[in-house]
Amino acid sequence: MTTVNLDLQNSLVAEKNRGKITQIIGPVMDISFLPGQMPNIYNCLTVKGKNASGDFIDVTCEVQQLLGDNKVRAVAMSATDGLMRGMEVIDTGSPLSVPVGETTLGRIFNVLGEPVDNLGPVDTSITFPIHRAAPAFTQLDTKLSIFETGIKVVDLLAPYRRGGKIGLFGGAGVGKTVLIMELINNIAKAHGGVSVFGGVGERTREGNDLYMEMKESKVINEENISESKVALVYGQMNEPPGARMRVGLTALTMAEYFRDVNKQDVLLFIDNIFRFVQAGSEVSALLGRMPSAVGYQPTLSTEMGTLQERITSTKEGSITSIQAVYVPADDLTDPAPATTFAHLDATTVLSRNLAAKGIYPAVDPLDSTSTMLQPWIVGEEHYETAQGVKETLQRYKELQDIIAILGLDELSEEDRLIVARARKIERFLSQPFFVAEVFTGSPGKYVSLIDTIKGFQMILSGELDHLPEQAFYLVGDIEEATAKAATIQVQSE
């Protein structure tokens, strides 16, 4: 009897529910099923067949709404060109699932978890569904701890929270990509962690450039792909909104495996979080929802919250997320960036002025913020040093107009000292990157938080007033700066 039941079960699994397309509106389609065979919300549906010219079509879509009358409305994950009414649709019976684990490292995937780098198939023995619940409240790690990056300006003035969310603001050409690659490199070396990069609705050229630069800087190891430190998931600008709306979840799912199963610290990069919202708004009207403020989807906060709540620290491991934020028309009150800000623990703002001076990383020390910079979290010493650095730089900024008009000589003795120290601080905030060794020629430096604090304390106290300011430019810790000063002195003699 049991054998008969098993056979019956197997035949039911093999016999998937089938429906037919009744309407296609751009990336959205309506599909009718037989009574009692309706798919669940978020189920993955596939359309396989031939178009009018005889070419093979394979489109995956995701159920978004149950319309009644045995109809569902679904969003396509790839172009709907060539689809026709009456085509057969198969319900896979489960949400979209993607490969996870070590096999993903060094590879590029699309939203469906298919490799798109022409390096052959990926082992799909372990897959996770992209729609998963956020960790339970009891599993969360409530300790506030700093995530050390080894980058002086970040660790001192706008420290990242382990398992926190960081917004990365900056225009074109100020060094976002290099900063991202350095963070990927440092987490692998210092924390033994891995990274997942989600390219959401950005330029395909940038995605390709990032891949090439990662291979050049050995973040992706071509000789031994399994030794790579990052997995890449791309859903670029040319993809339909369905893919751009879900590619962030695909990347997050891959990151969750490393956190929950491998118990590692993971860095998740999302470039760009605004495009995730934008894709949702493109689909929203087609799904028949009333637009809300500025034409955005009424479900904006829910969609953002569902994604962001899954990015967190548990007692097992952490996902620290760095999200590039595009601000439409530089309007910070726009609903998309405003909703994003509610979730961020820190902001890293890149400045074009610093990049123009040749100070890299071009992180603006006065505009970048962090909720972690509190004396009871980072300690009194770190807090006092950071405040001292900010005060000195702020005073220097105020004095710049006077210097431009009257010159340095017109300043008081005290102000001249502040300017000299501020210029040293500004230069000491720069540092050579491992991933930039190829084009700078100077070896990269990872500076521990203790060394960073010690260095800035010495500059603020006036111990190093006698050293030339160029000794502080592009060095690691303060010992290196004093050694460089000695070399400069010898050369000048």
From Swiss-Prot:
One of its GO terms (biological process) is proton motive force-driven mitochondrial ATP synthesis. SMART domains: AAA. It is a peripheral membrane protein. Gene3D superfamilies: 2.40.10.170, Bovine Mitochondrial F1-atpase, Atp Synthase Beta Chain, Chain D, domain 3 (1.10.1140.10), P-loop containing nucleotide triphosphate hydrolases (3.40.50.300). Disulfide bonds: none annotated. ATP binds at residues 170-177. F-type ATPases have 2 components, CF(1) - the catalytic core - and CF(0) - the membrane proton channel. CF(1) has five subunits: alpha(3), beta(3), gamma(1), delta(1), epsilon(1). CF(0) has four main subunits: a(1), b(1), b'(1) and c(9-12). NCBIfam families: atpD (TIGR01039). This is ATP synthase subunit beta, chloroplastic.
